[in-house]
Curated annotation (Swiss-Prot):
Superkingdom: Bacteria
Protein source organism: Pseudomonas fluorescens (strain ATCC BAA-477 / NRRL B-23932 / Pf-5)
Region (Linker): 227-247
Catalytic activity: alpha-D-glucosamine 1-phosphate + acetyl-CoA = N-acetyl-alpha-D-glucosamine 1-phosphate + CoA + H(+); N-acetyl-alpha-D-glucosamine 1-phosphate + UTP + H(+) = UDP-N-acetyl-alpha-D-glucosamine + diphosphate
InterPro entries assigned: Bifunctional_GlmU, GlmU-like, GlmU_C_LbH, Hexapep, MobA-like_NTP_Trfase, Nucleotide-diphossugar_trans, Trimer_LpxA-like_sf
Region (N-acetyltransferase): 248-455
GO molecular function, one term: UDP-N-acetylglucosamine diphosphorylase activity
Catalytic residue list: H360
GO biological process: cell morphogenesis; cell wall organization; lipid A biosynthetic process; peptidoglycan biosynthetic process; regulation of cell shape; UDP-N-acetylglucosamine biosynthetic process
Keywords tagged on the record: Acyltransferase, Cell shape, Cell wall biogenesis/degradation, Cytoplasm, Magnesium, Metal-binding, Multifunctional enzyme, Nucleotidyltransferase, Peptidoglycan synthesis, Repeat, Transferase
EC number: 2.7.7.23, 2.3.1.157
Cellular localisation: Cytoplasm
Name of this chain's protein: Bifunctional protein GlmU
Oligomer status and interactors: Homotrimer.
Amino acid sequence: MSLEIVILAAGQGTRMRSALPKVLHPVAGNSMLGHVIHSARQLDPQRIHVVIGHGADAVRERLDADDLNFVLQDKQLGTGHAVAQAVPFITADTVLILYGDVPLIEVETLQRLLKQVGPEQLGLLTVELDDPTGYGRIVRDADGKVVAIVEQKDADEATRAITEGNTGILAVPGKRLGDWTGRLSNNNAQGEYYLTDVIAMAVSDGLIVATEQPHDAMEVQGANDRKQLAELERHYQLRAGRRLMAQGVTLRDPARFDVRGEVIVGRDVLIDINVILEGRVVIEDDVIIGPNCVIKDSTLRKGAVIKANSHLDGAVMGEGSDAGPFARLRPGTVLEARAHVGNFVELKNAHLGQGAKAGHLTYLGDAVIGARTNIGAGTITCNYDGVNKHKTIMGEDVFIGSNNSLVAPVDISSGATTAAGSTITQDVAPAQLAVGRARQKNIDGWKRPEKIKKD
């Protein structure tokens, strides 16, 4: 059975008080609409139609992709009118309708809903709520069959007492959708074309309305203001934390941990408080991450340790390597097994060989550093001449003295040593000692300057 998906994303979101279209507001580092599209793709539809209106150009620019068909709704005349804009493009047997501001919907929930659809049956996702204020109410007959959905503003007192609410998410036979949207009327309190009226039409046409419910009501929670957006964020993070813990991760405090992307984890991983994982992060077995760390698009091999207040972006830490506290590993950085990066060390596009060490107050950029090499405190690679970047190469078992400036391009061969305080501008051969500093001069009888008296 073929499937197409329609995502409604045309709303203005005035209560957000923002120039940004509502569906582009972020949850866990991705726009709300981005989350919905991600879930939709996992259902393997033949096409995804995104109905856009307010901020249409911004939405299209942010999320444009080959599998998305953006459909413009010039005037926002209701959900039924929005779906009708996509109908001319639909050819599939089944159409699933989703909402661009409902980012937490689970794929498993949608899969259950889709199983309810057939030529003579549609699937409707409903939710039981203690307080259904704002939701359309699911009206059932004496046999428990769904007969209609009544919107809050059109409901009488008895209907408002119903606690089963409409989520708006439904799956319908594709061949019938055009007929139903064509018959919609705006004769209601809002003066809009309600998609919910399709339910009564389906019942009138003799179709069965089968319902499913999410395991968690937050799956179908939308965000109309910043408070609701924050609630979605926190729920997403707690859910992400539970998933990681189920895979063998210890979180010191799941309430102080954020995932903003994709995380692949091994077992016996320990993550302390206030850690943020962004982009695609791979964490192998026995990794330890200290508090207040930000890790983006990085890979941490087995047994790697990141100490407090460190920042990784586009880095790879080898097996048993460690970094921090207060280390910064920028894009292109690779630490081989057992390499050590200490406090206040910054690396960019740098490769540290096995067992290499940079313990303190160091900048290494565009550098290749051999195994077991030791970088003294206060060392920097001078890799930029104002126009081009140049490479510093150090062989194995090199000893770099403290407070060195290594002016690239420069090659320090295996076994070489540089003296403390040196500025190294020339290549150093194997086993050589390089001294690149002024000779010390001691002056006898030196008299310190006296303080000038002010008038």
